[in-house]
Amino acid sequence: MGLTQLPEMLLAAANGRGVASVAVIERAGAEPHVYWVPASDSEPAFLAYSITKTFTAALILKLCEEGQLSLDYRLARWFPHITHADRISLRQLLNHTGGIPDYGGIRAYHEDLKSSPSIPWSFERFAAETFDKGLWFEPGQGWAYSNPGYMLLKRVAEEVTGVSYRALISERIARPLGLRRTFVAESIKDLAELAPGTSSALSPDGAPRDVRAHYHPGWVSHGVVASTASELVRLLDSLFGGELLSPHSLAQMTELVVLPTDPSEASLEQDASSRRGKPSYGLGLMGDPVSPWGLAVGHNGGGPCYSASAFHAFDLGSASVCAMGAIEEGFSAEDVVFDVLDHLAASGNSRAAQQGIATDGASPRS
């Protein structure tokens, strides 16, 4: 059992409910194997949601390498009015230890999303509902997942460069790595070429609505990347292959903070799987130093309609795996990724390589 199982695994996970894809780079520098369902002429694209945080972290680290920023810079340089901004570092924003509140549990956010999905909150509204009210804990004295923390990082990158976040991601990451279908979505029109799908989170009565026609990406406060599974595995493979950042920056990016064990203290975007040994977080990276596949890092993303998961397993031949779907219920991108990693571990990457499995550039036959 190895990569030959990918089509069957994806078909089972999607179960005819919508569009889904999976891509695998089985060893560092290899070409990706990619499959998608249902059959179509081109690989589908999706919103990657919080996988965007990995892009933001890489961008901030690149600006640090250029001398425009330092991870030790304090937030007070740009936002002096935020509580304890003089004690919150960019590093703490990146690893969610700065105490910046999130909006995931705020009723008004979900109510406004349902009633006005095409009119997102402004930066000022996100701020007013979260960090303008104070911090969740003293900087450096806890951990809590924070989308507004990454919204602040996005604004910092734009302030120091004078360039929009969309252009920065294109110029500093996507273009150098040849990611031609990866971009920051900023309008409803930007969703037109994505995989079709619906969401019940976009209407007051819970009726499913076409995400591409109604959902404004601005509801993701920190920005949201649209991409394909094959391009996201290329991102991870290139990132950890040293094509984007220096060894020093990568070491900082993968320095992990172990998450609180009490589920009431912290939560990730998807429930922790039993295959997680020690859930941790680096700089824009979810991670586990003692997973069944050794050190594994990456990120999950989820929101209306779309879900995504992409992880890199250093001790498994530096394999990278990404799954994405336009299926709101009953599909777990993370489970697909973990299943693929299990199969790679069981079959052995060296054996898979010797079998010479060819890259499938089209959707599997059904």
Predicted regions and their residues:
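Alpha-helical structural context
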Residues: 78, 97, 159-160, 176, ...
